[in-house]
UniProtKB/Swiss-Prot annotation:
Optimum pH is 8.0. This is Esterase Rv3036c. One of its GO terms (biological process) is lipid metabolic process. GO terms for cellular component: extracellular region; plasma membrane. InterPro entries: DUF3298, Esterase_Immunogenic_RsiV, PdaC/RsiV-like_sf. It catalyses: a fatty acid ester + H2O = an aliphatic alcohol + a fatty acid + H(+); an acetyl ester + H2O = an aliphatic alcohol + acetate + H(+); a butanoate ester + H2O = an aliphatic alcohol + butanoate + H(+); a hexanoate ester + H2O = an aliphatic alcohol + hexanoate + H(+). It is found in: Cell membrane; Secreted, Cell wall. It is a single-pass membrane protein. It comes from the Bacteria. Its EC number is 3.1.1.-. Belongs to the RsiV family. Hydrolyzes ester substrates carbon chain lengths ranging from C2 to C14. In vitro, acetate (C2), butyrate (C4) and caprylate (C6) are hydrolyzed with high efficiency. Has lower activity against laurate (C12), myristate (C14) and caproate (C8), and weak activity against palmitate (C16). It comes from Mycobacterium tuberculosis (strain ATCC 25618 / H37Rv).
Amino acid sequence: MRYLIATAVLVAVVLVGWPAAGAPPSCAGLGGTVQAGQICHVHASGPKYMLDMTFPVDYPDQQALTDYITQNRDGFVNVAQGSPLRDQPYQMDATSEQHSSGQPPQATRSVVLKFFQDLGGAHPSTWYKAFNYNLATSQPITFDTLFVPGTTPLDSIYPIVQRELARQTGFGAAILPSTGLDPAHYQNFAITDDSLIFYFAQGELLPSFVGACQAQVPRSAIPPLAI
C-alpha cells in the first residue's frame, strides 16, 4: 500500500490552476507558495481529500525532486476523486528535512521527503524518498555510488541499524540477514559530516505496527564514502 501512489497508473485529470501535462513543474505550478527558507507549501482540498506538502525549491537536482512530488500528488488526487465519498476525507501529507556534509565546493546536499497517506484502508501508510547530490561532481548520489569500490558496507551497517532500531522501538525481534543485508532497503539515506541516516518505510524492516523509522550510523564505523 505504501507505494501505491508512486506506481499508480495516472489517468487524465483537469484541476484548475495546476500545470498542463508536459509543463515544467514549479512551486507556483503545483499551486503552492514559496515561504521562508526557500520552502514550497502546497495545500489543496476537496470534498474527498486533503493534501498538504512542503519541500525545498533550491535543491541542486530540483527537477527530480519536483517530479516525484508531482507524481505522488497527481496519483493521490486521482485515486481520491475516483473513490466514493466517505466520512473522513482521504489524506496525504508530505514533509521534508535537509542535511549537508562538507564545505562547498566539496560538499553534499540531502533532502528527505516523508509521506503520510490515508486512502481509507485499515492502516494509513508512511514512507520516505531521499535525494542526495554531490556538489563537487554535479551528480546525484545513490547507495550504489556512495562507497569506495571493493568495500562491503552492509556488513558494518546492518548490525548497527539493528541495534539502533531495537533501542528506539523496544521491539526485540531480529531483522533477518536476508532483509538486513539487502541493499534495496538502504536506498533512502542522508549524509552528514559524522553519520549516514537511513530511513525505512512502514513495514520495510520491522512489522507495520512499529511504523516508519530511521537509524543513524556513524561514518567512523563504516567503510569510507566515495565523495
